Amino acid sequence: DMKISHTGSNGNLAEPEGVKIAPNGDTVYMTLQESNEMGWFSLSNPPDVLQDKVTYSNPIHEPDGIWVNSDGTLICTAGEYDGTIGVHSLDASGKPVTQRFIKMADDLPSNWDWEDKRKGIEPEEVVIAEAGDKTFVLTTLQDAGAVVVYDITDPAIPKYDSGAITDMND
């Protein structure tokens, strides 16, 4: 029974939001949305209290969805509060070593519109897809009812690929 009861550096209580098991089948990564952190632990040797965590360098990322690529070297997170996709490189031990953030507002078509002006672009979930020698991150946008795709083959230089509003809103 691992406890997650700490307060983040932003003063908010850590609350698990998204979870993904790494390809090694042992490391669990989770987003801690309100405390603006990501935590991880070993399934084979879970701690009593979550110890391995990192605070996002973007103070308003507040991650929701999370995905780990097939070789466990990259994690993407959906920044629900700030409208970004986090692209984070991992070292050989699985610890995050770089944090990059894709600001989707810079890339989305100007004719896209949705109702929630307070929150704006609100990514919920992310998936990393690999096709040939390319790596992509796909994210869903809650209020726009959209899916957005970025090429992250070079995580340092993400490129907007495509997006579509699904027209499934009420």
Residue map of PLM features:
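Surface-exposed loop and turn segments in beta-propeller and other repeat-based domains
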Residues: 1-11, 49-59, 93, 97-118, ...
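Conserved beta-strand position repeated across blades of beta-propeller domains
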Residues: 20, 67, 127-129
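Short loop/turn segments immediately following the C-termini of beta-strands
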Residues: 33-34, 80-81, 140-143
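Structural signal for beta-propeller blades
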Residues: 36-38, 83-85, 145-147
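Short loop/turn segments immediately following beta-strands, especially the blade-tip
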Residues: 40-48, 88-99, 150-158
